[in-house]
Amino acid sequence: MYPAHLLLLLAVCVSLLGASAIPPLPLNLAQFALVIKCADKGKRPRWHYMDYGCYCGPGGSGTPVDELDRCCKTHDQCYAQAEKKGCYPKLTMYSYYCGGDGPYCNSKTECQRFVCDCDVRAADCFARYPYNNKNYNINTSKRCK
C-alpha cells in the first residue's frame, strides 16, 4: 500500500470512531410527527408541538399551562412507564395505520404496541384541544414552577 492510502484509511477509521461516540437521535420522533399529522388531519405543523407550554418538547416541569400541554405531560408519563417495562420509547419504531378516524396501532411486540399507544393517545389528545399561540416558546423558568 502507498503511504497516501494508509493515511486515508487512518482518517476514515478515526472519523468512524468519532461518529460512534455521537448519541443516537430519537428515531421515532419523525414517526410520532406522522401519527400527529394523521390525528389532526395536517391542521398544524408538527414543530409547533416541540416547544409548547411546560411539557411539549424536551424535559417538562411544573403545572401544564392548558389541556394541550397536559396531553404532553401524559405522553411523558406514558414514555416513563414504557421505560419501566424495559422499552426504549424514543428509539422504538412501530407499525400503525392511518385510517379515516385517525391512527391505529398494529405493532407486533409488546414494546412497539405500548409506545405506539402512547403516541396515538397523545396525537388524539392534541387533535382534541385548541392550540394557543401564546403558549408557544414560553419562558419556562417563570411559567413552569
From Swiss-Prot:
Its EC number is 3.1.1.4. Disulfide bonds join C38-C98, C54-C144, C56-C72, C71-C125, C78-C118, C87-C111, C105-C116. It is found in: Secreted. Its cofactor is Ca(2+). Residues 22-27 form a propeptide. Expressed by the venom gland. CDD domains: PLA2c. Ca(2+) binds at Y55, G57, G59, D76. The active site is at H75, D119. Binds 1 Ca(2+) ion. It catalyses: a 1,2-diacyl-sn-glycero-3-phosphocholine + H2O = a 1-acyl-sn-glycero-3-phosphocholine + a fatty acid + H(+). Residues 1-21 form the signal peptide. Pfam families: Phospholip_A2_1. GO terms for molecular function: calcium ion binding; calcium-dependent phospholipase A2 activity; phospholipid binding. One of its GO terms (cellular component) is extracellular region. InterPro entries: PLipase_A2, PLipase_A2_Asp_AS, PLipase_A2_dom, PLipase_A2_dom_sf, PLipase_A2_His_AS. Belongs to the phospholipase A2 family. Group I subfamily. D49 sub-subfamily. PLA2 catalyzes the calcium-dependent hydrolysis of the 2-acyl groups in 3-sn-phosphoglycerides. This is Basic phospholipase A2 P'513.
